[in-house]
């Protein structure tokens, strides 16, 4: 086998892509900071049980596992940074009020999550802890849309769902709860034949409600249909009210209600959302409320957040990251060295052409040149 081959769905990041990823990363982290989010950097590697406190079987299957040569315990390479950030909030920071945290780092998946998806993603996201009200959900929702607009994406569609609807149906019907994992998979995949098979022997109300969920998709008027077709349970009514409120706050994106879009249902506890753009089959960002995740670390806190894959965003973003630069000659000249140093200190990119390579400009747009005029080094347009 060739020594230069990489595993399937794993790829190097070359200069042009890396520059674009870094440009987007800086934009997003700066925007998070403008909202008051503090950055944290959890480790890539942890004990497996710490990484799998939530997320169900899906997260377990996506997590790479290995044996620690020091302790003999099983370690995991993180597949999602959200549980790690929840651990930091619950166990290390231990604050009592509202905490806003953000992060950016690689995650690894045993299998790709979607069509053309990489198994090594660069996850970036933001989380709010300590506030159970819809204000936190609204802020996270708006921050996610702000972030996507900063990347230059257009015609964004925000799909809203709520984990409370399915949870209420399971709480009322023990038989449905017992096959919850299978029902979740059928709903998330909109596998109607499988859903019909799983619900054949359930109570009439539960069966009708579960079979209605894949059809409850569309604009905000779908919520009125949901009130008519779903059981009149207080938990379902509150969930639909939450979605109506969040949908009404969105002014800069199309909003759709999809009560079967249950990505991450295993650890979500409230409103869930995913962002889509034309021409991309998978969600470009997703998030939601997950109030119980911190419980495994000794302190359950209200929490909501979102994340996205920067590598995927960079692939579809129209942002141009080819930076302007100044071309300078390579010459043993103290005045030239001082001029180049001063320009770099001022934030300019200065590329000194090595002897014999004056025509090679790499991928920078050298729109200016540093030239000697009357004994002084000055900048001129190229």
Swiss-Prot record:
The keyword Transport does not apply. GO terms for cellular component: cytoplasm. Transmembrane segments: none annotated. Keywords: Amino-acid biosynthesis, Cytoplasm, Histidine biosynthesis. Pathway: Amino-acid biosynthesis; L-histidine biosynthesis; L-histidine from 5-phospho-alpha-D-ribose 1-diphosphate: step 1/9. It is found in: Cytoplasm. GO terms for molecular function: histidine-tRNA ligase activity. GO terms for biological process: histidyl-tRNA aminoacylation; L-histidine biosynthetic process. The keyword Cytoplasm applies. It comes from the Bacteria. It holds the Pfam family tRNA-synt_His. Required for the first step of histidine biosynthesis. May allow the feedback regulation of ATP phosphoribosyltransferase activity by histidine. This function is generally fulfilled by the C-terminal part of HisG, which is missing in some bacteria such as this one. Heteromultimer composed of HisG and HisZ subunits. PANTHER family: HISTIDINE--TRNA LIGASE, MITOCHONDRIAL-RELATED, HISTIDYL-TRNA SYNTHETASE. Belongs to the class-II aminoacyl-tRNA synthetase family. HisZ subfamily. This is ATP phosphoribosyltransferase regulatory subunit.
